[in-house]
Amino acid sequence: MTNTLPVAPWRLFSVEIRAVRRLSPSFVRVTFTGPDLDRFADNGYDQRIKLALPLPGQRAVYLPQGPDWYAQWRALPEHRRNPIRTYTARAVRPYLHELDVDLVLHGDGGPASRWAQQVRPGDEIAIAGPDAGYEGDHGGREFRPPSTGCLLLAGDETAVPAISGICERLPLDACGRVLLEVPDPADVLPLVAPPGVEVTWLPRNGGQYGDRLIGAVADAARDLLAASGGGQHRQSTAQPHVPVAGDGMADGAPVDDVDVDTTILWEVPDVPPSAPLYAWLAGEAGVIRTLRRHLVSDCALDRRAVAFMGYWRQGRPDPTS
């Protein structure tokens, strides 16, 4: 009799960078290859993965092995602990043992930004991702729309890979709006979406985060809700107010109870089956907080129909996982 070990939802993959391609001034695509990437689950949509990056001066990653590798990693002294950051699996080609990840170039203010600027073929890292051998829900996906209603997908450049992955998997009869705020007009990338999903790129051109996205989301939400007959726009002529530290909500708390400077803004509620509009928002936490407040407070959209994720916070370092 053979004892078979249970398969965990996630596992570590040892990978090497096969190719690095600059997509635009702000985006670079890294293609990874590895002997076990045929077991990397191709879940699509906004599937999150973890990249363990090299320590300064290294071109490879050396992580603890075994099912408890994460606990072992957390127990390491800080100077020996490889930075781990969260990204989206942009494309998976198991038959070629390949995985694409799109990185945003944000200068060199943190380990992930520095690595993105310096990465080159031949470098080695480790990736924690979904194991195709696991038959249940892997986790790490936050796009959970109702079966009816239109979609509103909005975010800044850090959400472009996830929203692009979502759009590629939408049914052909999907309807809605996609709003993507990016630094530069040259950052407008090819994006595949169903005919009924309108995609709008919003270059900041040196402006502040949210300068274009906040107003665009307000207009799109008003139009989509009016077309569907849902929602009650309580402040039809007002623009969403600019947030200040201390605003926000998470975990069902009132809008003003969470400080995004100290708390991760992240909530993916169970969606009501009859929602006229489903909103998926991701990007800079202060901007996302404002967008969520507008949809729920001003547009009277059921808060269960708004998934919102503060991917990062302006002026604060990206936390280690």
Segments from the language model and where they lie:
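Extended, composition-driven regions rather than compact fold-specific motifs
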Residues: 1-321
